[in-house]
């Protein structure tokens, strides 16, 4: 969940944000699209799937559900198992965004929300790529994902020429060995990332690697 002051605190569901972002991207593409010094474009930096509580995100989530369940609220209720704990919805307009602070949230709702959030990220990247390709005929376009494999958005923007990733082998104490993880790390991370990214399109890129200890 993001708010002002956090990294990547943008709402991809906001039409105003998208409009202004697309204007800026198109101006850049017009200026650099035929520049022989430019070989390619990296969209954003480590785009991710975020819990977005912007009012526009809630409206877009409802539209996402309407399309997925073919405007049939009963189909949604059946899929989400809402008869349990009296969660039944009478209308798509009653549905709110899942709030992580609440106990015992409906996991089907959370899963659909994560799919919605992934689709927002993918669509935003795809639209940026298509804008650039209007002007950049001989330049590739990619983005660099953090390999958060469970978020489901990686590889979901078909306009990209190839997928790229960022990988830090030593960046924390999450290897089960305490703070030694900052020194030892896990070199298998890069092998796993290679195996994950290569099958998506055959070609893939590595945009960030860690040369030593973390510096942020």
Question: Can you name each region flagged by the protein language model?
Answer:
Residues 163-167, 179-181, 186-215:
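Active-site core of glycosidic bond-cleaving carbohydrate-active enzymes
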Residues 2-189:
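Polysaccharide-binding and catalytic clefts of secreted carbohydrate-active enzymes
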């Amino acid at each position: 969940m993001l708010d002002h002051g956090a990294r990547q605190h943008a709402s991809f569901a906001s039409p105003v944000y998208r409009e202004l972002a697309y204007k800026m991207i198109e101006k850049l593409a017009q200026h650099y699209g035929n520049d022989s010094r430019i070989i390619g474009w990296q969209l954003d930096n480590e785009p991710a799937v975020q819990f977005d509580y912007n009012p526009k995100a809630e409206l877009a989530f409802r539209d996402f559900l309407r399309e997925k369940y073919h405007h049939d609220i009963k189909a949604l209720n059946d899929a989400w198992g809402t008869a349990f704990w009296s969660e039944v919805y009478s209308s798509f307009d009653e549905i709110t965004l899942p709030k992580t602070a609440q106990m015992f949230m409906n996991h089907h709702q959370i899963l659909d929300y994560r799919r919605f959030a992934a689709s927002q990220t993918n669509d935003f990247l795809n639209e940026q790529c298509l804008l650039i390709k209007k002007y950049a005929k001989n330049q590739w376009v990619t983005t660099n994902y953090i390999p958060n494999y469970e978020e489901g958005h990686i590889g979901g923007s078909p306009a990209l020429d190839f997928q790229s990733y960022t990988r830090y082998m030593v960046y924390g104490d999450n290897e089960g060995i305490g703070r030694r993880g900052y020194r030892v790390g896990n070199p298998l991370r890069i092998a796993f990332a290679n195996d994950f990214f290569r099958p998506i399109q055959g070609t893939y890129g590595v945009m960030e690697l860690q040369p030593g200890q973390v510096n942020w």
